Amino acid sequence: MGRRYFGTDGIRGKVGDAPITPDFVLRLGYAAGKVLASAPGRAASGARPTVLIGKDTRVSGYMLEAALEAGFSAAGVDVMLAGPMPTPGVAYLTRALRLSAGVVISASHNPYHDNGIKFFSADGNKLPDEIEAEIEAWLDKPLDCAASDGLGKARRLDDAAGRYIEFCKSTFPAAFDLRGMKLVVDCAHGAAYQVAPHVFHELGADVIPIGVAPNGFNINDGVGATAPDALMRAVRANHADLGIALDGDADRLLVVDHTGRLYNGDELLYVLVKDRIATNGQVEGAVGTLMTNFAVEVALKEAGVQFVRAAVGDRYVLEQLREHGWQLGAEGSGHILSLDRHSTGDGIVSALLVLAALKRSGKTLAQMLEGVTLFPQKLINVRMKPGADWKGSDAIRRAIDSAEQALSGSGRVLIRASGTEPVLRVMVEARQATDANRHAEAIADAVKQATA
């Protein structure tokens, strides 16, 4: 049976609408607490589980934090409160402090009126599907509050931000520093606002912070990785060397160079792979997604690096990295994984990896990406009748085959059905925009005629 509440990145929705309500989140805390308490070895040891709760800067975070805390306490689980903390910071602290689990209250790049809950295991990884299924099963059981002497306790984690700042700095090579560099750091009015500027400043950079005045309602609003225009303007206005854009929970990274040019996760993955090749001699493989630009795949293969596409979502990139035993993966949106540095995507750590690559090479981002020009993409969303059998259409198949034959080795076709509405997404990449447009429109026309 499929999961009812957990998606690819925890539980998420509009605050006040099910399931992001205080009563549900209290029960979620209780259910998660009971699963943790019954983990193998936990009951036998008699040790009380302890979880860490971090959050971003949404006004609803206070309400949901209190509800989670109450649920965990009712299940007999102790709670440590980190306050505003990037998602990767919660993952790191959970592992470093040897806690039972970590919980993040955040809806990442979404607007302030959304929020969500995601869990990390004791080793700093997102919970396996089977554990999330156990938690959902407990949600159907009565809430049986622990006796007074068995209730969980709650306390603030002293210097949570400072601990995470030191971890981030430790991932930057000791042989380098950032003295002489002017950086604009955009924290999206989100979870990294008390952390990211300090990391880069303490490593020697002249830091110009933006997006560091959260009021509970302005997270991701015209700032951050989902709205990089503000950063691009700030970099040019301040004559900065580089701009760093994080999202609301700081697990994404986009970078802007001194000219104001924006670099996405696909391009940054290529930069990091090239840096590893220069320092280690070779990189066996890297992981992208179905949406990774074809130019990056071509460039990596030309560099002798295997490339695998995962389903869209950093969870699936991580699965492929583990399956192949590789270290580097990314999504175009800015989720970058470097498993020799962290167990999850970390915008700050990823920025430090990019900065280290620039320091080692003595090149700019544009120079490191010389010869790699992203292919133009044409995306057309075609609305269909609900339940239309587009896969069984010979006309659609012929249109796809025709495009793939014409683009062989110089582009690709991706057809994806929306998971939430009767829409077929037709995406074509080609070296020339005219070719991408022509083939995408031909396929879209075939879809419209076959599914009308």
UniProtKB/Swiss-Prot annotation:
It comes from Burkholderia pseudomallei (strain K96243). It comes from the Bacteria. This is Phosphoglucosamine mutase. InterPro entries: A-D-PHexomutase_a/b/a-I (IPR005844), A-D-PHexomutase_a/b/a-I/II/III (IPR016055), A-D-PHexomutase_a/b/a-II (IPR005845), A-D-PHexomutase_a/b/a-III (IPR005846), A-D-PHexomutase_C (IPR005843), A-D-PHexomutase_C_sf (IPR036900), A-D-PHexomutase_CS (IPR016066), Alpha-D-phosphohexomutase_SF (IPR005841). The active site is at residue 108. Mg(2+) binds at residues 108, 247, 249, 251. It is an enzyme of class 5 (isomerase). Belongs to the phosphohexose mutase family. Activated by phosphorylation. GO terms for cellular component: cytosol. Catalyzes the conversion of glucosamine-6-phosphate to glucosamine-1-phosphate. GO terms for molecular function: magnesium ion binding; phosphoglucosamine mutase activity; phosphomannomutase activity. It catalyses: alpha-D-glucosamine 1-phosphate = D-glucosamine 6-phosphate. Its cofactor is Mg(2+). Binds 1 Mg(2+) ion per subunit. Pfam families: PGM_PMM_I, PGM_PMM_II, PGM_PMM_III, PGM_PMM_IV.
